[in-house]
Amino acid sequence: MDKDNLAEIEARKKNWEESTLQKSLARYRLQQSPTRFYTPLDTRDHDFLEKVGFPGEYPYTAGTYPSTVYPLMRLRARGIADDMRVRRAGSYSGYGTAEDSRDFYRAMQGRGWTGGPNIAFDLPTQCGYDSDEPMAVGEVGRVGVAVDTLRDFEVLYEAFTGDRDLDKTASNFTINAPANIYLAMYFVLAEKRGISIDKLAGTPQNDILKEIVARGTYIFPIKPSMRMTRDSIVFCAEHTPQLNPVSISGYHMREAGASAAQSLAFTMANAIAYFQLGVDAGLDVDKFAGQMTFLTLGGSMDFYTEIAVRRAERRVFARIMKERFGAKNPRSWIQRQPGVLFLASTTTAQRPLNNLTRAVVGGMASAMAGYAPSVSPPYDEPLGLGWSLEAQQLSEDAMRVLICEAGMTDVLDPFAGSYFMESLTDKVEAEAWDIIKKIDELGGAVPAIESGFYHREIARSAYEFQRGVETGEKVIVGVNAFLGENELEVETSRLVAHPYDPKKRDEAEQRQLDNLAKVKKERDNAAVKASLERLKEAAKDESVNLIPPLMECVRLYASEGEMVNALKEVFGEYEGYGSL
């Protein structure tokens, strides 16, 4: 737009503010407007082709791909086409012992959830403890499945054979610090089934930096932890081209309290650190970039910001890969992630059915940002019942309504060119680049984390948010507002029994202890001990990739705790960041 037009708009805007707007404010006795109106003045220097472009083309602001298949769900509803989505068996889940989870997956397969598993592990497993260690007491099988040895993987994967075997379905492992141990188990299990590991597909989370910053299931100090991540990246690039070694995660930092811009910046800074590991190990960035995935940044109820931050993150990532790493393959410029996942911490135990409304808002933001309109988590998440079949059905149906009835996925990047959205996207991007610059000045993600920079920034942001809730400045319906005696407290109920019997969960710990004791009694313990010694020797040599020696230990049924303890003797343990 030329300068004369901008000058005219500026003059007309001033006249509007002084006359039309002021009359409206006076009527309602307001000093300033609670709303904003955007014009070309807010995007004076905006270059559409440079900043937005077209879907599936650099800088990917308008979308990762030139088209999506989500609208085809309408054809599936009419029986014209198969469902393009394959639902993971049980979604994200894991219960009790391997037998319990196997049976649960089979039950869910009977309901049409035929994809591979997205395995939730219990806390002892995530933190490197065997089920028979003192630190594991009371936690075995509680928030996920207990997996101590290859024997547990063998049992769990009895639910995935035939046309669902390891080379025909993908597995996700929500595991971080000990991720290489579980990759080793997956590889050895494939070997035992006669399946070449280059046919395996799946994704371990394996993002140790965000664990140290936000979640806490760390084991080793940062530098040896990054060495383990390097080993994952290199091994997968060389041997398992269909398997993604890392899912770089912003979600958990957002849950910990990071703002949208902080979450974007910290995630990208962590991504830079991980990509640099591969490059420093001698890999061509275009060889492994396509195997690196992202777990969404997480979404708040700030609808417009959540759309803007997704547009900005695609642009930021594309710039990092093209300009910083010199990637030549356009596939390397694409940020691979599932979409906008509504933050579980935004759900409330009070009036839980309101959470479905909140999740629908998140689904709409996801659709308008160019992804599937995932209506998640289920409304009963804060009640500890996020697995209820009623809640899952409502979430699934809400997504179907958004796609099939509302047509939310019919248009790619519907806000493209909007004065408001483009200015907001630019603002979020600029804030993120400022933080990334600060992290670079500190030496990169690892030194910045070691200095406490991430922790302090997230703590400050979390405090500001919580203070807003407690003062009432941040309104949360049914929690700090609209609580009068005339408000109806709507209760929820479960009508369908869950396939996993809670009684089994209560008995899981003893059964798992019995399973582990049996394995340790029947295996060749002398061979296990020797393999653990070889693992320690390998760990002392920085140049050695530890996945092959871990596979050797796994074949002999060494336990996770034994392998972790052997590595602790060489690496030590992470003590955690101190005061803020």
Outline where the language-model segments fall.
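Active-site cavity-forming subdomains of large catalytic enzyme subunits
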Residues: 110, 114, 119, 123, ...
